[in-house]
């Protein structure tokens, strides 16, 4: 079956992928998925995040050990946009996954681009930040995810935390 990976010459077939200029000539190079990931040195990641306020407090989430180099730092809830997903829908989905809260996006308050090295790769992050309103749900912690705790903080409290750049923007 055809997938979006066909267009870039990486042909899915079971757990083995092929990298070849001609999609019909799979003899050039045969790679496992792990090997294919290792040769990718430039990554663009588009994410959507929410600023959630409760009176004078902002909701922040602590990054887990699944985020090497940033574990223990605090950030805004949110995450990667899936292929074909609208940014606002991604923010709603990611916030609920990480916090248990259902939110309504109100307005985009920031969109920016950041380039840095992460995990031995050149990473280009494009982030869309929404002001969002809590519409329901109950605050809980994500299990086995990129965050392990979420908590409401006043601006003064948040400034004492180890924050990633996105967390600093949120306060």
Indicate where each model-derived feature is located.
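Acidic, metal-coordinating catalytic segment for phosphate/diphosphate chemistry
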Residues: 18-51, 55
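Nudix hydrolase/Nudix homology domain
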Residues: 18-19, 71, 140-171
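A short coil-to-beta-strand element that immediately follows conserved catalytic motifs
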Residues: 102-110
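Active-site-adjacent beta-strand/loop module that shapes the phosphate/pyrophosphate-binding cleft
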Residues: 113-139
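Extreme N-terminal basic, low-complexity initiation segments
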Residues: 1-11, 15
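A generic structural micro-feature
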Residues: 40-44, 70-73, 120-126, 144-147
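Conserved Nudix-box catalytic region and its N-terminal flanking loop in Nudix hydrolases
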Residues: 54-97
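Short, well-ordered beta-strand micro-motif
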Residues: 52, 129-133, 152-154
């Amino acid at each position: 079956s055809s997938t979006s990976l066909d267009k870039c010459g990486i042909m899915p077939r079971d757990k083995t992928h092929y990298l070849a200029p001609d999609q019909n000539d799979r003899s050039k190079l045969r790679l496992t998925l792990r090997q294919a990931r290792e040769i990718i040195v430039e990554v663009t990641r588009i994410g959507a995040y929410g600023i959630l306020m409760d009176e004078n407090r902002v909701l922040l989430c602590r990054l887990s050990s699944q985020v090497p180099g940033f574990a223990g730092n605090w950030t805004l809830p949110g995450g990667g946009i899936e292929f074909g997903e609208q940014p606002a829908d991604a923010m709603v989905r990611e916030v609920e996954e990480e916090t248990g809260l259902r939110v309504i996006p109100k307005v985009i308050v920031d969109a920016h681009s950041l380039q840095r090295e992460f995990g031995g790769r050149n990473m280009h992050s494009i982030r869309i930040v929404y002001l969002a309103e809590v519409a329901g749900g109950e605050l809980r912690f994500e299990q086995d995810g990129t965050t392990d705790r979420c908590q409401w903080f006043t601006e003064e409290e948040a400034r004492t935390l180890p924050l990633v750049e996105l967390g600093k923007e949120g306060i």
